[in-house]
Design a protein with these regions (language model features):
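Right-hand nucleic-acid polymerase module
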Residues: 1-35, 41-149, 158-161, 165, ...
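Long, hydrophobic, amphipathic alpha-helical segments used as structural scaffolds
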Residues: 66, 70, 171-178
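Catalytic palm active-site di-aspartate
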Residues: 96-100, 148, 152, 173-189
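"…together with the soluble PPM/PP2C metallo-phosphatase catalytic core" -> "…together
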Residues: 155
Length: 303
C-alpha cells in the first residue's frame, strides 16, 4: 500500500485529509527567529500540529529503525552534555569545530540512498517503496531540514552515520577520541593533535557535502580552559559548569529569595542543571540560602 494509506490506517485519519497536508506541507510551518550569540539570527520553523503528527509517525515507524553511531551524543535517549564531556575529560588536548549551516545543508539526497539501502523496512510495514518520497514531503521543506521539525534531529544523526563510522575508525587508528554532538565535532587526545587530523576531518566533511565553520574552530589544552559542549574540564580533569555560571546561579537565587526578582522557572532550570553537573555545589547553595526561607527552598522558588 501507499505510505499515505498506511499512515491513515495507523492514525485513524481520513486518507484525503492526510494527502492534503502532505502535498501542502511547505505551508504548514510557522517561522520565527531567535538571536544567536554572535548577534545573528536563526530561523526556527515550527510545524503545525497536523504536520507534526505525521512527522512523529515517520520518526517512530521508519527513522527510529535506521542506524545511528554511538559517537553521536545528541538527540538520543539517555544522551546528555554531561556524558559527552565525561567522554573527553581525561584527554589533555581537545579540538573542536562545528558544521556550517548544519540542518539546512541536509537535503533529501542525503537521506534517499539510506532509505534505499533499508527498503526492507518498508516491506515490513507493507508499504510500497515507490511511495518513499512521502518521507521527503513530510520531513523536508524546500529540500532542507528545518530547525524546529520533530524529525530533523534524528535525520541529522542518520545521515551522519557513515561519516561518524569513518571518523571513529580513523581516530582509533591515530590514538584520538572522536565524538559529535549535533553539529559540534570534538577530537581529543593525551598527546598533541596534529593539524593533519583536522585536514582529514575537513576533507571527509566536504565529501559528505558539509563545511567546517572556521569561526568556531579551536584547539585547547590544560594551559587554557577546555570546554566540551559548554562544560568546563579543570586542570584536575573534573567536569564543572564553570565559575561564571556558578556565580550567575548564586546571584539569581539570592535576588529571587531576597528581592523577589527574576523568573522562577528559569532559576529552577539553572538549579536542575547545577544539580546534575555539580551536586556538591548545588547542596551547598541550598544549605546557604535556606537561612532566608522558612520553607523548602525549591518550593519557595516554585511560587
Amino acid at each position: 500500500m501507499k505510505m499515505i494509506d498506511k499512515i491513515a490506517a495507523d492514525l485513524c485519519l481520513d486518507r484525503d485529509y492526510i494527502f492534503s497536508v502532505v502535498k501542502r506541507s511547505q505551508f504548514y510551518y510557522r517561522d520565527y527567529y531567535i538571536y544567536k550569540r554572535d548577534g545573528g539570527k536563526r530561523q526556527i520553523s515550527q510545524p503545525s500540529s497536523e504536520l507534526k503528527t505525521l512527522q512523529y509517525w515517520v520518526k517512530n515507524n521508519i527513522l527510529s529503525k535506521l542506524p545511528i553511531s554511538s559517537s553521536a551524543y545528541a538527540y538520543q535517549k539517555g544522551a546528555s552534555i554531561k556524558k559527552h564531556a565525561y567522554f573527553h575529560k581525561n584527554s589533555k588536548y581537545i579540538f573542536h569545530t562545528d558544521i556550517c549551516n548544519f540542518f539546512p545543508s541536509i537535503s533529501y539526497e542525503h537521506l534517499q540512498p539510506i532509505l534505499q539501502d533499508n527498503s526492507k523496512l518498508f516491506e515490513n510495514l507493507n508499504i510500497d517503496f515507490d511511495s518513499v518520497e512521502t518521507v521527503r514531503d513530510i520531513c523536508y521543506r524546500e529540500n532542507k531540514l528545518c530547525i524546529g521539525a520533530v524529525s530533523s534531529p534524528i535525520i541529522s544523526n542518520i545521515i551522519m552515520y557513515k561519516f561518524d563510522v569513518l571518523m571513529l575508525d580513523y581516530c582509533k587508528k591515530n590514538g584520538l577520541k572522536y565524538s559529535r554532538y549535533a553539529d559540534d565535532i570534538y577530537l581529543s587526545s593525551c598527546s598533541y593533535i596534529d593539524r593533519s587530523h583536522v585536514c582529514f576531518l575537513s576533507s571527509l566533511l566536504n565529501k559528505f557535502g558539509f563545511r567546517i565553520n572556521t569561526k568556531k574552530t579551536y584547539f585547547s589544552s590544560p594551559k587554557y580552559r577546555r570546554k566540551v559542549t559548554g562544560l568546563v574540564i579543570g586542570t584536575d580533569y573534573s567536569v564543572t559548569i564553570g565559575t561564571e555560571k556558578r556565580k550567575l546561579i548564586k546571584k539569581l537565587v539570592y535576588d529571587k529569595l531576597i528581592h523577589n526578582k527574576g523568573d522562577s522557572n528559569s532559576i529552577l532550570g539553572y538549579l536542575a542543571f547545577l544539580k546534575d553537573i555539580e551536586p556538591h555545589t548545588y547542596n551547598n547553595i541550598i544549605a546557604k540560602y535556606s537561612q532566608y526561607c522558612t520553607e523548602d527552598i525549591i518550593e519557595a522558588l516554585s511560587k
